[in-house]
């Protein structure tokens, strides 16, 4: 049903009408159809920083110094200026109002990187309930590092990786966690996942999932490490068993002692093989059982042994979605071409409860129907619970099914869709301007996913969803007059405030030229 676009009429309607139960926030978000970032300040004079993102509650704007040594945090404010003449809306903004400082107030600058380290500009996780921020610094990669101490052959090494937990209110460093001669994929926060107060960090080099708890005091506390061992007392049990064997040898009972680094499969790998074997063993037909054991288990046994953990996400406080694949795929920039597997792991029972290949139809249909369960968010975060997905938005579902119908090979389509799993933590913007029930836009040019995209000299249009031919606003990255050199490849990122009609577009080239920052807001 058509609703008026007049803000005053909508305010009166909100006063006299009671929305249906459970729809009050959706009704309130419709006001964003009227309040849009329709005005642009081009090529804003701003600090030479690498801008990261707004926090999910909109209280902070995170950036890093260009030398990747310092964290610089701003408080978003709103433009204020005085006008002596009548009808101020028809005049250009005064020069002072067109600066970065008119929209952002610097709170502090903190040096995070020590000697030899650099801040990973793509890594930032925010704990909204305590207003804590998690950042990462690291030294350079060593690509041909020898696999010592049980490390995986072919995985690079980083001499020092440090995770810093900060209180964003004042920039105080509350705690740090250091990994030496290890490898954690820090790009786009792939190697870490935050769920409420639980933090999972994946060590690719040593194949461990470190589960930590972030206390209200700001302490990082070890909960468990999943990989070589699954239960807290596994290592104690194996060491005590080895001691018994040593005593037997001393008493004349000659047994071959196990080699600590090569005798046993890791705990998580043993759980995986056990799940696959039991699934086949439960086959009622004995002939079918024997054939499946030969074809699906013993024939691929070494392939399963060679799998390594690529990526992890929480499904809830007790279950992890773990992605397995080859060593090459784990460190490759384009892991989509490599076969992979997904396992659901229960941390309390230490059991694998589900296992799928990345081409499994069953997993895809689960993802299509229950996409929101993969994009888990903190219970305390109101803003993250209303992002559009194909399981909660009919327009997103239609777009997905259109893409699926165009696919010539359904198996390849499934693999392409499953490449996004496990989902990266806090990788989507909760801005209402990405709500597909309110606006329609070209997702090839802009979307809620936090990624750089190829820039265009044409404005990106946001069309009203209820009135399909009405342009609500448009955003143009780069200089107002367009690029003078059409051959130079340019990339662009968009940083939307989660609540206010405020966004930044940052256009940069691959030749270390100065970035072009535009501010889009409602005037």
Swiss-Prot record:
Changing residue 34 to I: In dg; induces a much darker mature-green due to higher total chlorophyll content. Its main location: nucleus. It comes from the Eukaryota. It is found in: Nucleus. Keywords: Nucleus, Phytochrome signaling pathway. GO terms for molecular function: ubiquitin protein ligase binding; ubiquitin-like ligase-substrate adaptor activity. GO terms for cellular component: cullin-RING ubiquitin ligase complex; nucleus. Changing residue 498 to S: In hp-2j; induces higher fruit and doliage pigmentation due to higher levels of carotenoids, primarily lycopene, and flavonoids in the mature ripe-red fruit. One of its GO terms (biological process) is red, far-red light phototransduction. Transmembrane segments: none annotated. It holds the Pfam family Det1. Probable component of the CDD complex, which probably also contains DDB1. Belongs to the DET1 family. Component of light signal transduction machinery. Involved in fruit pigmentation and fruit nutritional quality. Acts as a negative regulator of fruit pigmentation. Probably acts by participating in the CDD complex, a complex probably required to regulate the activity of ubiquitin conjugating enzymes. Repression of photomorphogenesis is probably mediated by ubiquitination and subsequent degradation of photomorphogenesis-promoting factors such as HY5. This is Light-mediated development protein DET1.
